[in-house]
From Swiss-Prot:
Keyword Membrane part of the UniProt annotation: no
Assembly with partners or alone: Homotrimer.
GO molecular function, a single term: metal ion binding
UniProt-recorded name of the protein: 2-C-methyl-D-erythritol 2,4-cyclodiphosphate synthase
Domain of life of the source: Bacteria
Keyword check for Metal-binding: yes
Pathway: Isoprenoid biosynthesis; isopentenyl diphosphate biosynthesis via DXP pathway; isopentenyl diphosphate from 1-deoxy-D-xylulose 5-phosphate: step 4/6
Organism of origin: Clostridioides difficile (strain 630)
Cofactor: a divalent metal cation
One family name in Pfam for this protein: YgbB
Enzyme class at the top of the EC tree: lyase
Amino acid sequence: MRIGLGYDVHKLTEDRKLIIGGVEIPHDKGLLGHSDADVLIHAIMDSILGALALGDIGKHFPDTDEEYKGADSMKLLEHVYNLITSKGYKIGNIDSTIIAQSPKMAPYIESMRSNISKVLNTDIDNINIKATTEEGLGFTGAKQGIASQSICLLLLTSQNN
């Protein structure tokens, strides 16, 4: 088994959609980034890549590459899933936290879990997502950005045991 930790942050800005966990969330601002800036998916991908000792999302999907401009992070997650299986692993579980003062994430968490479990070909019970605020402190508390943390456990597939 292997464990990986991921973290991502993006600045909130006008004239962008807010997409988190593959869900478009109604909000007056969205996240700024080269791709769709899905902070949750980016943290999850980094945790998986870390568990596989394959670097980070900047190595695999550089923001200097026009191919990834405006990219759907769920499609990038599909690529990361292929790396998991090619290395002989499967998802054990993923536990993630979204850190945002607003909007409230609770109404969207089940859709996020469903999206992620489908792409990673794992039971929805293996995907946990929590949301918290920083009580008005820091850049997330000041509503300047949104952050996410993720930890994953990868298990060897049965054919590799």
